[in-house]
Every structure is written in C-alpha cells, then in structure tokens.
Amino acid sequence: MLTDRKFVVKTTLDLQDDISSVCCSPCNRYIIIASGNNCQHIYYLCATNLEILFKFKAHDDSIVHLVSTLDGKYIVSSGLDGLIKIWNFKTANLANVLPKRDVRRMKFDVMENMWLDIAESIDISFDEIWQS
C-alpha cells in the first residue's frame, strides 16, 4: 500500500527561490534543479534524501532548460543569456560553451546519436558540440 509509512518519506527542500527547470540523471539517483536569484544556479540533489551535492552559478541570466545526456556524463543548460553550457556531471565543472543562440528547448535523441533540438530548428550533432 502506497500510504504505508515505510514507503512514504516526507522531505522538504527550502530553495527560497523559483525553480525554472528540473531534470533527473538517467540512473534516477540525482535530481538537477535550476533555481536561485533569477534562476541562475544549478543544484545537484541526491534523489533519496534531497541532500545538496553541488550548487553553483551557471549562467548570467535565468536558466530556461536543463537536460542530462543519456550516458549521464554531462548536464546541458541553456539560459536567457543565450548560451548553451555543458557541465561535467561528476565534477560540476564547465566542459564547453556553445555560441549564443535563442534556445527555448533542448532534447537528446537516442536514434540520431545525440543532438540538440533548439528553437531555430537547427540540429547540432554531439560531435559539433566538442568542435566549437
């Protein structure tokens, strides 16, 4: 029964700011949240107890989207500053920055290797990300 106490854990996380985007790691062990003043920060949380593992300023303006790569190695963020940033998942270090674009959505597609679908309907292959 779902209401049984051993299955229900009530946990609250007080970020004190709006949340603009949320994604989960492919293994579902981590939750990644964009929040903070003007939603510029990224928080890595442990999914089991919501412990904050990392918190860092990611963009100069609000983050509009977060996505995890399918292999779980990277988190990709897009912000109103027009940048797409690629973060090493394990270290939270910045791995790469793509040139400014008007990004409203992002996704990774398994069938097409990996690519980002951005607002301008330009497909960027994963190889192109590392060449920029």
UniProtKB/Swiss-Prot annotation:
It comes from Acanthamoeba polyphaga mimivirus (APMV). InterPro entries: WD40/YVTN_repeat-like_dom_sf (IPR015943), WD40_repeat_CS (IPR019775), WD40_repeat_dom_sf (IPR036322), WD40_rpt (IPR001680). The keyword Transcription does not apply. The keyword Protein transport does not apply. Transmembrane segments: none annotated. Pfam families: WD40. WD repeats lie at residues 14-53, 58-97. Keywords: Repeat, WD repeat. This is Uncharacterized WD repeat-containing protein L84. The lineage of its organism: Viruses, Varidnaviria, Bamfordvirae, Nucleocytoviricota, Megaviricetes.
